[in-house]
C-alpha cells in the first residue's frame, strides 16, 4: 500500500513539473511572437500604407475640379460655413489625428492601435487602394505663418494655423492638399 502511494506521488510530481515546463516555454514563445509582430507592423505595413494613401489622395485632389473632388469624396463634402472644402479638410485631417483626443505631429508618432484605425478608415470611407501610386512632397521646411493670407482654391476659407500639418518636423500647408506655388512645383510624380 505504501509503495502504491509513493509511486502515485512520484507520477503526479513528474507530470506537474513537465506540465509547468511546457506552459512556461509556450508562454515565452507567444510573448516573443507578439513583440516581433508589433515591431514589424509599426515599422512597415501600416505606416507605409497610411503615407501612400494620403499622398494618393493629395495627388488626385490637386488635379481635379471642385465638382470632381466632391464626386470623389461625397461623404465628406458637407454643407457648412466653408462649403465642401471644409468637409474634405476634416476627412484628410483625420488621417493624421485618427482621433480628436489623440493628436500627433507625425505618422511615425502613431501607436499600432491608431495606425490600424487609420487603415480601416482609408479602406472603408475612401475606397483607396493603399498600394498604388505615391506622391513625394518637396523636402522643404517652412512655418504656417508665412502663408496666413493665402486662400484655398474654390473656397472663401482663409486658413489659420489649424489648417497646417507638421509631418516629420516639416510644415505643410492646407492639410497636405494645397502647397504654396513655389513648393507645389517641386512635387514629384
Segments predicted by a language model, with ranges:
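Hydrophobic pocket/interface hotspot
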Residues: 57, 68-69
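Short, low-complexity N-terminal intrinsically disordered segments enriched in polar/charged residues
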Residues: 23-63
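Hydrophobic helical h-region of N-terminal Sec-dependent signal peptides
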Residues: 6-14
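Positively charged n-region of N-terminal signal peptides that target proteins for export
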Residues: 1-4
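A short hydrophobic beta-strand element
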Residues: 128-146
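Short beta-strand edge/turn micro-motifs at domain boundaries
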Residues: 151, 155-189
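C-terminal motif of bacterial Sec signal peptides marking the signal peptidase cleavage site
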Residues: 16-19
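Short solvent-exposed beta->alpha transition segments
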Residues: 70-132
